Amino acid sequence: MLEVYDDAVGACRPGAALADLDRRIRERIADAGYPGQPSHPVCHGVGARAHEPPYAHQAGGGTIEEGMVLAIEPGIYWEGGGGLRVEDNFLVTADAPEKLSSFPDGVVRCT
């Protein structure tokens, strides 16, 4: 899932189509053995509310623009409960997406 997340973050550039980002994430998850996942948007805007447009969706339109704040959240879920999702918020800049939290990516061991 971290590889899918990293790929999604890298594709989050001004001018990129939101539908292409959605398709890219879902294809990577399907290739890993989880077709049809996730059931929620894989990327959405963040502003006055935690979830707001734009929403990345294969059938949708729109492009990523510099200055947008986007939540990238690929995930997989198991029937009967449980799942795995990696999520963070990013400011879209001309050079590269800027992560807005200081929490480290990767696996964190809690003891």
Residues of each region from the PLM?
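Active-site neighborhoods and metal-handling regions in enzymes and metal-associated proteins
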Residues: M1-T111
